[in-house]
Regions:
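Phosphate-group recognition and catalysis centered on beta-loop-alpha active-site segments
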Residues: 102-109, 120-419
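Hydrophobic alpha-helical membrane segments
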Residues: 1-168
Length: 419
C-alpha cells in the first residue's frame, strides 16, 4: 500500500480536482470502496470457462464474491483488533516493556498479513499446498523481523536525539487544551494560553453574509429550535449572539476581529484556517488580507486552508503572510509555489513527504495528534510540530522524553508504517 501511495504521489493532479476530492473526501472514500468491490464482483462474474483457466475448481461467481468479501472482512477486523489493543496496552506500559509489546504487536501484524496473502493465493488458484507453507514462512519472517528489530533498536539507541524541547512545536487545535472549554472561542483561547502557552493556537474562520469573518468550524449552525442554517447566510451580529455548548461548557461565538485582538493582547501567535464551501466567493481571501494581514504579520500569525485557491489568492494579496496547505491525506503530488508549510493528517504522514517538504524549505505540522505514540511517530519522521487537542499532556511528555522513547518512535515508524 505505501508503494501505491508513493506512485500516486508522483502523478500531477490538477489543483481543482484535488480541491474537489478534499472537499468531498468522505464521499470520495465511499466511491473508492464501492469501486473496489465492483471490480471484485466483475472479476467474480467471468464465465465458467474463464474461471476454469484461473481456478483448479470451478466456483460460482456469487460464492466466490462472498468468500472474497468474508476474507477481506476478517483481515480488516483482526487488523483493527491488533491496532486497538496495541494502542491500549501502550498507555499502560513503561520503558522496555513498551518496546517488547510493540515488537509483539508488529510481529503479529506481519503474520496476519502473510496469512491473508496465502489465503488469497489459495482462493484464487485453489492450491492447498500453501497451507503447509504458512507456518514455515511465518516463522522465517518472524525470525528475520526480530533480528532486524534488535539491530534497529541498537542503532537508534546510540543515535542522537533531536532537541524536542526547542524545535518541536505544539499547536493547540481550535485553541483548546483537553476539555478546557468550547473550541474556537475566546474563553478557551485565554485558558489555553494560561495553562499551556502553545507555540501556536489554531482556529477556523468562515465569511458571513455581510462580508465579515466569524470564528467557527462547521458550515451549519443549529438555532434554538434545532433548525440548521448555513453560516454564510447569517450576519456576524446574528452569529455572535449564539451560545455554543459542548462537553459541559458554554460560550458565545466571536468575530475574528475580537478573537485576533484578544490573541495579540495575550501574545498568542495564531494559525488561522480559512474555511470555504461551494457557495463562497474566492475574493474573500483579498478581503481577509485587507482587514487582518498587517496585524497578523506584525504578531507572527499564519494562515492555512484546505482550498489551494485560497492560499494562492492570499499570497497574491499579501506575499509576506505565511500560508499553509491543509492535506486530509497525502497520496497526490506535492503542489509547489505559494505554500510556506503543510498541515497533514497523521494517518498518512510519512518520512518521504516530510523530507520532500524540507528540501523545499517548508515546514510540516501533523494533525490531529492526541496521544504519545502518534507524537513519537511524528518526531521520528521529522515533523516540525503537532496540532493537538491535548497540548499540556504532550508538552509534559516531550519535556521528559528519553532516548528510549524516541527509539520507540523510530522503530514504530520503520516497521509499522513501512514508509
Amino acid at each position: 500500500m505505501p508503494f501505491i501511495f508513493r506512485a500516486l504521489s508522483q502523478i500531477p493532479i490538477p489543483i481543482a480536482i484535488q480541491n474537489a476530492i478534499f472537499d468531498h473526501r468522505r464521499q470520495f472514500i465511499l466511491i473508492v470502496v464501492c469501486c473496489f468491490f465492483g471490480m471484485v464482483w466483475l472479476f467474480c462474474s467471468v464465465s465458467d470457462e474463464t474461471v476454469g483457466v484461473f481456478f483448479s475448481k470451478k466456483i460460482k461467481s456469487k460464492r466466490l464474491f462472498l468468500r472474497i468479501l468474508l476474507l477481506e472482512t476478517e483481515f480488516i477486523f483482526w487488523s483493527a483488533f491488533l491496532f486497538a489493543i496495541g494502542y491500549w496496552m501502550y498507555g499502560h506500559l513503561l520503558g522496555n516493556a513498551q518496546f517488547l509489546w510493540e515488537i509483539l504487536i508488529l510481529m503479529l501484524k506481519w503474520i496476519l498479513l502473510i496469512m491473508y496473502q496465502m489465503a488469497c493465493f489459495q482462493l484464487y488458484f485453489g492450491n492447498r499446498s500453501f497451507d503447509s507453507r504458512v507456518s514455515e514462512i511465518s516463522g522465517s519472517v518472524t525470525i528475520c523481523f526480530l533480528i532486524a528489530a534488535v539491530v534497529q533498536l541498537i542503532f537508534v539507541k546510540n543515535s542522537l536525539v533531536p532537541n524536542l524541547q526547542s524545535d518541536f512545536k505544539i499547536v493547540a487545535h481550535r485553541g483548546s487544551d483537553g476539555n478546557n472549554g468550547v473550541p474556537n472561542t475566546v474563553p478557551t483561547l485565554k485558558d489555553s494560553k494560561k495553562k499551556l502557552s502553545p507555540d501556536y493556537s489554531e482556529l477556523d474562520v468562515r465569511q458571513t453574509v455581510d462580508g465579515r469573518f466569524v470564528v467557527i468550524h462547521d458550515a451549519m449552525l443549529a438555532n434554538s429550535s434545532g433548525k440548521e442554517r448555513e453560516v454564510n447566510n447569517l450576519s456576524l451580529g446574528d452569529l455572535i449572539e449564539h451560545k455554543v455548548k459542548e462537553s459541559g461548557h458554554a460560550a458565545y461565538l466571536s468575530g475574528y476581529s475580537q478573537y485576533l485582538e484578544v490573541a495579540h493582547q495575550i501574545k498568542q501567535p495564531l494559525i488561522t484556517e480559512i474555511k470555504t464551501d461551494e457557495h463562497d466567493n474566492y475574493d474573500l481571501a483579498a478581503e481577509f488580507c485587507h482587514l487582518y494581514a498587517d496585524s497578523m504579520i506584525d504578531h507572527g500569525d499564519m494562515v492555512h486552508s484546505m482550498d489551494y485557491r485560497i492560499i494562492v489568492n492570499v499570497k497574491k494579496s499579501e506575499k509576506r503572510l505565511k500560508c499553509g496547505y491543509v492535506l486530509p491525506f497525502e497520496i497526490f503530488s506535492m503542489p509547489k509555489g505559494a505554500i510556506d508549510f503543510y498541515s497533514i493528517e497523521y494517518l498518512t504522514m510519512n518520512r518521504s513527504f516530510i523530507k520532500a517538504a524540507h528540501d523545499q524549505k517548508k515546514k510540516v505540522y501533523v494533525w490531529t495528534v492526541n496521544n504519545k505514540l502518534d507524537c513519537l511517530r511524528a518526531c521520528a519522521i521529522g515533523a516540525d510540530g503537532v496540532i493537538t487537542d491535548n497540548g499540556s499532556k504532550l508538552k509534559r511528555f516531550l519535556k521528559t522524553a528519553t532516548k528510549d522513547d524516541f527509539s520507540l518512535g523510530c522503530f514504530i515508524n520503520s516497521y509499522a508504517t513501512l514508509k
